[in-house]
Structure formats: structure tokens, C-alpha cells
């Protein structure tokens, strides 16, 4: 009985392996309560699934999409474009405006920006710490 049904389905789905995947997925849907599109005739769910594919009451493309969706673990989410996200600017004008746009706390601290070269020159001009008696022993 199932062999005849498989032969009928080969016209709709050329690949037998894909047919097995689709029919198995449809059989699981039927066992979980999906409505039948053909009469059961005392057949089991895999045979009913093959008959549905053979009679074209459900399309293989729809089954394939449902199968792919059921196997997906992560759903792709569209994220905003990188240009849409405002970039922080390191210009002095932007640094002067940023604290004014902040919450307005009286304790806001503003830091001066300096280049890496200025920072290195400042570190070179620092005197090394003097040794104390505790460090010498």
C-alpha cells in the first residue's frame, strides 16, 4: 500500500530522501493534531501524509518551509544599519556639547582630551618616585 503511494509521490517530489523528510514531518504534524486533507481510510499517519502529497492537497514547497522553520534554532532578526546608530565624536566641540546634553547633575566632571603623543611626553617628564626606607630592606 505505501509503495504505491511513494510511486505516486515521486512525480511531485523527485528526490526520495526529501520525500521521506517531508512525509515524516507531515506525519508528525498529523499526530500532533493537524487537520487531515484526505480521508484516513484506516491508514496510519505516514501513509496519510504520503497520500496528501500524492493528491496534492498540500504542496511540497509549503511542507519544506514548515520543516525548515521547525528545525531553526535561531531566527534572524533585522538589526538597524550601522549608519543609523549615532557615533561618538572625539572632537573638542562635541566634547563641550556632550556634558550640556547630559542629565544636568551638578557633579558632572569634564575631562580634557589629549593625543597619545601628548600623553607619552607627559609620562616621560614625570620624575620617578623616591625610595622610602621600607622599600630598601
From Swiss-Prot:
Q: Which UniProt keywords apply?
A: DNA-directed RNA polymerase, Nucleotidyltransferase, Transcription, Transferase
* Cross-referenced Pfam families: RNA_pol_Rpb6
What InterPro entries does this protein map onto? DNA-dir_RNA_pol_omega, Pol_omega/Rpo6/RPB6, RPB6/omega-like_sf
The Gene Ontology CC terms held by the record are: DNA-directed RNA polymerase complex
Low complexity: bias regions? 84-103
Q: Which domain of life is it from?
A: Bacteria
Q: Which reaction does it catalyse?
A: RNA(n) + a ribonucleoside 5'-triphosphate = RNA(n+1) + diphosphate
Keyword Transferase in record: yes
Q: Where is this region: Disordered?
A: 78-137
Q: Which Gene3D superfamilies match?
A: 3.90.940.10
Biological process terms in GO annotation:
DNA-templated transcription
* Enzyme Commission number: 2.7.7.6
Q: Name one GO molecular function term.
A: DNA-directed RNA polymerase activity
Which stretches does UniProt call biased (Basic and acidic residues)? Answer: 110-121
EC class (word) = transferase
Under the heading SUPFAM superfamilies, the entry gives: RPB6/omega subunit-like
Q: May I ask which residue range the UniProt record assigns to the signal sequence?
A: none
Write down the PANTHER family for this protein, in alphabetical order: DNA-DIRECTED RNA POLYMERASE SUBUNIT OMEGA
Q: How does it assemble?
A: The RNAP catalytic core consists of 2 alpha, 1 beta, 1 beta' and 1 omega subunit. When a sigma factor is associated with the core the holoenzyme is formed, which can initiate transcription.
**What this chain does, per the record?**
Promotes RNA polymerase assembly. Latches the N- and C-terminal regions of the beta' subunit thereby facilitating its interaction with the beta and alpha subunits.
Family assignment from sequence similarity: Belongs to the RNA polymerase subunit omega family.
Identification of the protein by name: DNA-directed RNA polymerase subunit omega
Q: Which organism is this entry from? A: Methylobacterium sp. (strain 4-46)
Amino acid at each position: 500500500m505505501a509503495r504505491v503511494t511513494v510511486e505516486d509521490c515521486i512525480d511531485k517530489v523527485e528526490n526520495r530522501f526529501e520525500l521521506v523528510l517531508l512525509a515524516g514531518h507531515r506525519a508528525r504534524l498529523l499526530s500532533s493534531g493537524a487537520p487531515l486533507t484526505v480521508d484516513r481510510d484506516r491508514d496510519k499517519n505516514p501513509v496519510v501524509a504520503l497520500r496528501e502529497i500524492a493528491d496534492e492537497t498540500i504542496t511540497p514547497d509549503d511542507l519544506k518551509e514548515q520543516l525548515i522553520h521547525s528545525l531553526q534554532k535561531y531566527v534572524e532578526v533585522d538589526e538597524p544599519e550601522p549608519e543609523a546608530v549615532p557615533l561618538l565624536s572625539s572632537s573638542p566641540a562635541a566634547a563641550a556639547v556632550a556634558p550640556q546634553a547630559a542629565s544636568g547633575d551638578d557633579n558632572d566632571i569634564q575631562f580634557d582630551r589629549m593625543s597619545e603623543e601628548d600623553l607619552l611626553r607627559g609620562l616621560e617628564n614625570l620624575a620617578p618616585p623616591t625610595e622610602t626606607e621600607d622599600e630598601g630592606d
